[in-house]
Regions:
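Conserved tyrosine-mediated DNA breakage-rejoining catalytic core shared by Y-recombinases
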Residues: 94-96, 152-193
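Phosphate-coordinating loops and pocket residues in cytosolic domains that bind phosphorylated ligands
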Residues: 7, 44-47, 118, 152, ...
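Generic beta-structure capping elements
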Residues: 45, 55, 97-99, 119, ...
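Catalytic-site neighborhood detector that most strongly recognizes the C-terminal catalytic loop/helix
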Residues: 4, 107, 168-171
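Basic, Lys/Arg- and aromatic-enriched nucleic-acid-binding interface segment
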Residues: 64, 68-72, 83-153, 182-183
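N-terminal core-binding DNA-recognition domain of tyrosine site-specific recombinases/integrases
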Residues: 2-88, 102-105, 123-131
Length: 193
């Protein structure tokens, strides 16, 4: 059954990926994939079974990236099953519905930008308090650093007027190499930064 094979496959995910990815994979399988196909035999699994998982998630309003991740999980699982000679099933037609939309990003507006540089307080439980991280927020806006890169920044990363980005800290407090290969980079500080 798929649910039994999933346990084996997930053990390989744990060995080969970071904690953040493991949590995301486990969550998608627990909430979306296993309830739909967990009781099926791997030999009776069809591409439509997998597409139904994606379509149901789409109708529930999941963002395009989440749907892509669902597809990637199920493709990786099928590839692992093929490697173990459990099936020859290859879901090549599995796709994200055309109407799927990316999650919108909230862009900092000019009036909010002015406020960021004029005010050093934040609302905390309905009260205005001094924000200890105000300079970090300003630095992030001026440099374009991702939040995890900002947390991972060390004084040793600044040499002269150049900042070398080589690490990030994820939501679990783990040090990583960054979001992708482009995350390792260097830039010259502006006068304002």
């Amino acid at each position: 059954r798929v649910e039994d094979l999933y346990q084996e496959w997930y053990a390989t995910v744990v060995k080969t990926t970071g904690t953040g990815n493991q949590r995301n994979v486990e969550s998608r399988w627990r909430t979306r994939i296993l309830p739909a196909i967990g009781r099926k035999r791997i030999t009776s699994l069809t591409e439509q079974d997998l597409q139904d998982v994606v379509n149901d998630a789409y109708s529930d309003g999941l963002a395009k990236k989440s749907l892509q991740s669902l597809c990637a999980d199920m493709r990786a699982f099928c590839k692992w099953c093929r490697a173990k000679k459990l099936t020859t099933f290859h879901p090549e037609g599995l796709h994200v519905p055309a109407g799927a939309r990316p999650k919108g990003k909230k862009v900092l507006q000019p009036d909010a930008l002015i406020t960021l540089f004029r005010v050093d307080t934040s609302l905390y439980r309905g009260k205005r308090v001094h924000d200890d991280f105000i300079h970090a927020y300003r630095f992030q806006v001026l440099t374009g650093l991702r939040p995890g890169e900002l947390v991972g920044l060390r004084w040793a990363d600044v040499k002269g007027g150049t900042v070398f980005i080589s690490r990030a800290v994820n939501v679990l407090g783990e040090q990583t190499r960054g979001k992708n290969d482009n995350a390792v980079r260097a830039f010259v500080l502006s006068d304002l930064a």
